């Protein structure tokens, strides 16, 4: 798919039109449920410009991003357009697992994306992690959480893999979820919602 023109451009035009018809009040803005950063800069700018007018003072404004399509230029654009929270789809810090999940970024790219976002000025950073992949052990999962808390993140979302094409062990997944509920709070991330853990004051208002 060409995310710079054609159907993508028509979609953003239609979406911008719908956004333009929204009144208020708006309590949160969340652009995601896909990969907004896959869009070319002109379309991304159009989407953000159309949305920014809804972002009143103090409103949580989140954009989802994938490591492979997040760069300095897009981070600057986000800041210019009032985005104050990023949710980065890290998924894993192990290259073999990322490949098995069909992700095209590397573990290093994921960590670099988080660090760059922090350097650019994003103080409210979430990362998504997936547990329960085939052949994943409890030790593997613990190592993922250990790496996550070393990064400058304020929020961690942990999701169990759900894919009919990739069988998972429900008991193993349950143990990994229990591990998350023990490990992350012990390191300052409060378990405030089913899949979400946050440092004090950084709970996602949109959840």
Language model: regions and residue ranges:
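A long amphipathic alpha-helix within ATP-dependent nucleotide-binding catalytic cores
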Residues: 186-188
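Conserved non-cysteine loop/helix-boundary elements of the Radical SAM core domain that shape
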Residues: 1-182
């Amino acid at each position: 798919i060409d995310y710079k023109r054609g159907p993508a451009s028509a979609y953003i035009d239609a979406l911008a039109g719908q956004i333009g018809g929204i009144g208020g009040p708006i309590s949160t803005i969340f652009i995601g449920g896909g990969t907004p950063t896959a869009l070319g800069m002109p379309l991304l700018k159009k989407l953000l410009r159309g949305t920014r007018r809804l972002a009143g003072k103090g409103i949580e404004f989140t954009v989802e991003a994938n490591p492979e399509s997040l760069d300095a230029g897009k981070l600057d654009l986000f800041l210019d357009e009032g985005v104050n929270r990023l949710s980065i789809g890290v998924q894993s810090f192990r290259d073999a697992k990322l490949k098995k999940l069909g992700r095209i970024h590397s573990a290093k790219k994921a960590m670099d994306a988080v660090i760059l976002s922090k350097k650019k000025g994003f103080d409210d950073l979430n990362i998504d992690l997936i547990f329960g992949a085939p052949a994943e052990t409890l030790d593997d999962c613990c190592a993922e959480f250990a790496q996550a808390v070393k990064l400058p993140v304020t929020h961690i979302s942990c999701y169990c893999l759900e894919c009919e094409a990739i069988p998972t062990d429900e008991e193993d997944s349950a143990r990994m979820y229990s591990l998350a509920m023990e490990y992350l709070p012990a390191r300052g991330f409060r378990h405030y919602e089913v899949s979400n853990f946050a440092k004090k004051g950084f709970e996602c208002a949109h959840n």
